[in-house]
């Protein structure tokens, strides 16, 4: 019972750490593709080395190394 209470308390602290917002703490935030000198290409593109933790504004594209 104590373990469940401690886990619940930990979750509550993590969600309240953002100044009362309901966003959990993220250790790795997604970055825009262009901020890492990447290029957004169509998801069907075969000659693409994907970049981790990046995103494109168009959901039909993925971030590739330039």
Swiss-Prot record:
| Positions in coiled-coil regions | none
Keyword Secreted in the entry? The reply is yes
Cite the post-translational modification comment.
Stereoinversion of L-Met-26 (in DLP-4) to D-Met-26 (in DLP-2).
Q: So which residues are the signal peptide here?
A: 1-22
Tell me where in this chain the PTM D-methionine is found. Answer: 26
Which residues get removed as pro-piece? 23-24
Q: Out of the domains of life, which is the source?
A: Eukaryota
Q: Which UniProt keywords apply?
A: D-amino acid, Disulfide bond, Secreted, Signal, Toxin
Give TM segment ranges.
Answer: none
Annotated S-S bridges: 33-63, 40-56, 48-64
| GO CC terms in record | extracellular region
Compartments (UniProt record): Secreted
Per the entry, what this protein does is: Does not show antimicrobial, myotoxic, hemolytic and cell-promoting activities.
**Name of the protein described by the UniProt record:** Defensin-like peptide 2/4
Which organism was this protein described from? Ornithorhynchus anatinus (Duckbill platypus)
């Amino acid at each position: 019972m104590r373990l469940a209470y401690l886990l619940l308390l930990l979750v509550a602290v993590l969600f309240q750490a953002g100044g009362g917002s309901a966003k959990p703490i993220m250790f790795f935030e997604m970055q825009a593709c262009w901020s890492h000198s990447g290029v957004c290409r169509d998801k069907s593109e075969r000659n693409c080395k994907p970049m981790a933790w990046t995103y494109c504004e168009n959901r039909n594209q993925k971030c590739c190394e330039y």
